């Protein structure tokens, strides 16, 4: 029941954010990859599929770099779900973009890996290449853990390929 509530809440927030972003332009990313890439036991590694929205209206250029909020989620092949919202930095070297991010979120293990808590933190580094005027192809590596706030803290390392498009 708790999982269903959070899923509906996330969907509602995501759709409202997307509707607001449609007034201008929206940056939507779709990604797929491997969950728990460095699985020592070999029993938790699975595929993942996700979506992420970046709000260009809230983009800020600061002395530390360019930042914007992100909201997204993914589901794994073992029915684990992670829903998150956070901030992403943007640093560019020509057509190459380096995009570090940090996102707290809600994790539901489903039939997959128990990360020890519903509250998990995702840190990610993404390297992207502008392939067309409004499109980007990226490689990401992320780590999700609960910072020892949960019963256990096994953490998980993930990697994925992302396609981003501004609509």
Label each region the model flagged.
Residues 53-55, 89-91, 129, 143, ...:
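Residue-level signature of outer-membrane beta-barrel architecture
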Residues 1-24:
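Cleavable N-terminal export/targeting peptides
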Residues 20-25, 56-67, 92-98, 134:
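Short loop/turn motifs that connect adjacent beta-strands in outer-membrane beta-barrel proteins
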Residues 27-38, 64-76, 99-108, 140-145:
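Transmembrane beta-strand segments that form the barrel wall of outer-membrane beta-barrel proteins
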Residues 37-47, 73-84, 112-118, 148-156:
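Solvent-exposed loop/turn segments connecting transmembrane beta-strands
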Residues 46-51, 129, 154-167:
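Outer-membrane beta-barrel "beta-signal"
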Residues 21-57:
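Outer-membrane beta-barrel initiation region
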Residues 78-102:
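Helix-adjacent hinge/juxtasegments
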């Amino acid at each position: 029941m708790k999982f269903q509530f959070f899923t509906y809440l996330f969907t509602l927030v995501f759709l409202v954010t997307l509707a607001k972003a449609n007034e201008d332009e929206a940056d939507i990313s779709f990604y797929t990859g491997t969950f728990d890439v460095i699985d020592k036991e070999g029993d938790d590694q699975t595929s993942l599929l996700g979506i992420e929205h970046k709000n260009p209206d809230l983009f800020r250029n600061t002395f530390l770099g360019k930042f914007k909020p992100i909201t997204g989620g993914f589901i794994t092949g073992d029915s684990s779900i992670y829903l998150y919202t956070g901030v992403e930095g943007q640093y560019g070297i020509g057509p190459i973009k380096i995009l570090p991010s940090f996102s707290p979120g809600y994790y539901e293990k489903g039939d997959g890996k128990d990360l020890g808590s519903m509250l998990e933190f995702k840190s990610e580094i993404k390297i992207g290449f502008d392939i067309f005027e409004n499109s980007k192809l990226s490689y990401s590596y992320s780590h999700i853990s609960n910072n020892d706030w949960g019963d256990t803290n096994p953490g998980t390392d993930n990697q994925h390929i992302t396609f981003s498009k501004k609509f």
